[in-house]
Design a protein with these regions (language model features):
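Soluble catalytic domains of enzymes that build or remodel membrane lipids, polysaccharides, and related
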Residues: 1-172
Length: 173
C-alpha cells in the first residue's frame, strides 16, 4: 500500500515441486510519529490475505504487524486469508518492547496454511532490537488428515476487508 514500506513476497519450491509462498511484512504502525490511523497497516495485511485466498496458496506470513492477535484487523486477516495463527495454544509471545519488562505486547506474528504443523516455537533472548526474535520450526504435511480447521470470512467480512483496503490505499496516497 505504501511505496516506501518494504514487504517481501518470495516463493519456496520444495523437492517435490510444490510451491510455498512466503510473505514478510512490516506495515506502518498507527502512532503520532508514523500514521494517524491504522488504515494503511490494515490495508497491507488484508491485501496479502485476499491474495493468498484468491490464489489458493500454501503460505507462511511473518512479520512485525504492529497489531495484537486479538484486534479486529488481525482476526479479519485470519478469516480472509484462511491461515492459522501459530501462537494459538502455544502462548502469547510478547515480543515488543524488549527493553521494558512490564510493558510488552505480542506484535510479531507467524501465520501458516493448515498444511503446516508447528513442531517448535519459542521467543528467543534479547538481540539488541526493540523486539525479541521468534523461532519456529514447521513440518509440511499436505495430507488431508493433518490439516487444521480454519476460520473463513463470510460475505460481510469480505466486503469489510475490501472497504478497509480502499480506505488504506486512499490514505497512503
Amino acid at each position: 500500500v505504501e511505496r516506501d514500506i518494504p514487504s517481501i513476497c518470495s516463493q519456496l519450491v520444495l523437492r517435490s515441486g510444490e510451491r510455498i509462498r512466503i510473505y514478510c511484512l512490516h506495515p506502518t504502525p498507527p502512532s503520532p510519529t508514523e500514521s494517524d490511523t491504522s488504515a494503511p497497516r490494515d490495508a497491507e495485511l488484508l491485501l496479502v490475505g485476499k491474495q493468498i485466498r484468491e490464489r489458493d496458496e500454501t503460505a507462511l506470513v511473518f512479520g512485525d504487524l504492529n497489531d495484537v492477535a486479538w484486534s479486529h484487523s488481525t482476526r479479519l486477516f485470519k478469516k480472509v486469508s484462511e491461515l492459522l495463527d501459530a501462537r494459538i495454544g502455544r502462548g502469547m509471545f510478547n515480543t515488543f518492547h524488549a527493553h521494558y519488562r512490564f510493558l510488552r505486547w505480542p506484535l510479531d506474528h507467524i501465520f501458516q496454511s493448515p498444511e503446516f504443523q508447528i513442531k517448535q516455537m519459542a521467543k528467543l533472548s534479547d538481540i539488541g532490537s526493540d523486539h525479541f526474535p521468534i523461532y519456529a520450526k514447521f513440518q509440511y504435511c499436505p495430507a488431508e488428515e493433518h490439516k487444521h480447521e480454519v476460520e473463513t470470512a463470510d460475505t460481510g467480512e469480505m466486503s469489510q476487508a475490501d472497504e478497509k483496503i480502499a480506505e488504506g490505499r486512499e490514505e497512503a496516497n
